[in-house]
A protein has these predicted regions:
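Catalytic cores and adjacent flexible loops of soluble metabolic enzymes
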Residues: 1-169
Length: 169
């Protein structure tokens, strides 16, 4: 976990850079920074991604965030602002971490795609189909999943006025 450990605390940037040094020595030019424990924050993401970019400008960085404290997408925005273009996520936010107390699921794919599209990034992903898949997965696992876009839909989703009147009563 690049952004914090529930047993050892903060992961110093220098410690993470030593790991990246080892990868770079093997001519690895792409790595994923994992937030498996859900401890990343926008400032910790910024510090580590900037340090890697400064020391290893050839290194492509991908980011893997959990939404444990509700700031997974805020961390994505920081990554986007720093030039990161690869992110890992899961349908409906499925996932977790069995060894990290309190850790919850990953950033929801449908929420991530919605954020990217609304921010002007072309993903090539059919958001409507993705939402349908997330809703189906929720039914299969038999519990409410944390995805927001799968519940609310895109911001410009239109509803019938008659349906709204019936819902209000």
């Amino acid at each position: 976990c690049a952004f914090g450990c529930p047993f050892e605390g903060e992961v110093p940037v220098d410690a993470a850079l030593r790991v990246v040094d080892a990868y770079a020595a093997l001519d690895i030019d792409r790595l994923t920074l994992g937030d498996t424990t859900g401890m990343a924050t926008p400032p910790t993401v910024s510090r580590l991604v900037q340090a890697i970019a400064k020391r290893f400008p050839q290194m492509r960085v991908a980011l893997h965030f959990h939404n444990t404290r509700g700031i997974g997408l805020a961390n994505v925005v920081v990554g986007l602002d720093l030039g990161v273009r690869e992110f890992e996520s899961s349908i409906g936010g499925l996932g977790g971490c069995p060894f990290a107390p309190g850790a919850t699921g990953n950033v929801c794919t449908e929420d991530l795609v919605y954020l990217l599209e609304e921010s002007g990034f072309e993903t090539g992903i059919d958001l409507g189909a993705l939402i349908a898949v997330a809703q189906r997965v929720e039914a299969i696992v038999g519990r409410t999943l944390p995805g927001q876009v799968m519940k609310a839909g895109p911001r410009l989703r239109k509803y019938s006025l008659e349906g709204a009147k019936r819902a209000v009563g």
